[in-house]
């Protein structure tokens, strides 16, 4: 692996005593000194938290027919949304495997802004650029914009205190200004709570972070790292690319078919996904709730009461809200909700119940 890239807020994280780790080729904060993941998680569920997720990619597809072109490539149907609306979508290969899951911001028929995952940005840009018609440009803007996520019940109040738009519908976005500086504001997130993702220019990230952090902490909130982001998204059953979605785990298997425009005449992987949907997937993503002290972790083996192997855990953690182990697992088509399964937790058998996520109730809208 080459040298890790850093967020424009790296020095701020160091000042806050952040524990950092590699994630998608970036050095990012996992948790902050003095509190830890459990406190950061609780802050988001009960008040508000601020995350630096500037490692996320950014790209723009622009030119005559740009939106129509994107719609023939990515799975979801951009015709379902209009200008000022964002949409969760997938970039698949010809086998139906998931190259990435990402957010498409629909600006206009000739302008679509994309936010892929950090490690997959270059590949998404490469694939789109290779197929782009004459006049349509695909531009990698990875370090042109930072991304700050403000998440939790008090998130709208935080934005109002900064004079930023806070009343938009879920998955709507707007070009706004903060102290004369441009910032994209989207009503979205990865936690299950009310929240916003703010995209300032890279050079404007530090002053915006500083003011946001002051307001957030004044409302009883905390800066939060990727550790809490992972526990929050797992409680909601949101998939993480590379674990619950991948080149070998299709949208049909991962229950992400809602993000596929099945009636569209074209998108990458269409034929393979239609065939898999018609036949029924051989395995599907389920939730697991521990019945003892066992905590599921990725790649742990899952078996039935008779010892037959049923699949493996793809994501797992201790749920700070439920105070028990929870996880996501890719399991055989014979499995159904309510089944009890055995998970090999470091050589010890832990009994878990198969459930359909989310594990907790939340209100992202």
Curated annotation (Swiss-Prot):
Name under which the protein is recorded: Aminomethyltransferase
One annotated GO molecular function: transaminase activity
InterPro entries membership: GCS_T (IPR006223), GCS_T_bac (IPR022903), GCST_C (IPR013977), GCV_T_N (IPR006222), GcvT/YgfZ/DmdA (IPR028896), GcvT/YgfZ_C (IPR029043), TrmE/GcvT_dom1 (IPR027266)
Species of the source: Parafrankia sp. (strain EAN1pec)
Subunit structure: The glycine cleavage system is composed of four proteins: P, T, L and H.
NCBIfam families: gcvT, PRK00389.1
Catalytic activity: N(6)-[(R)-S(8)-aminomethyldihydrolipoyl]-L-lysyl-[protein] + (6S)-5,6,7,8-tetrahydrofolate = N(6)-[(R)-dihydrolipoyl]-L-lysyl-[protein] + (6R)-5,10-methylene-5,6,7,8-tetrahydrofolate + NH4(+)
EC number: 2.1.2.10
Gene3D superfamilies: Probable tRNA modification gtpase trme, domain 1 (3.30.1360.120)
GO biological process, one term: glycine decarboxylation via glycine cleavage system
One Pfam family, short name: GCV_T_C
Source species taxonomy: Bacteria, Bacillati, Actinomycetota, Actinomycetes, Frankiales
GO cellular component, one term: glycine cleavage complex
Highest taxon in the source lineage: Bacteria
Swiss-Prot/TrEMBL keywords: Aminotransferase, Transferase
Function (record text): The glycine cleavage system catalyzes the degradation of glycine.
Residues that span the membrane, as ranges: none
Family per record: Belongs to the GcvT family.
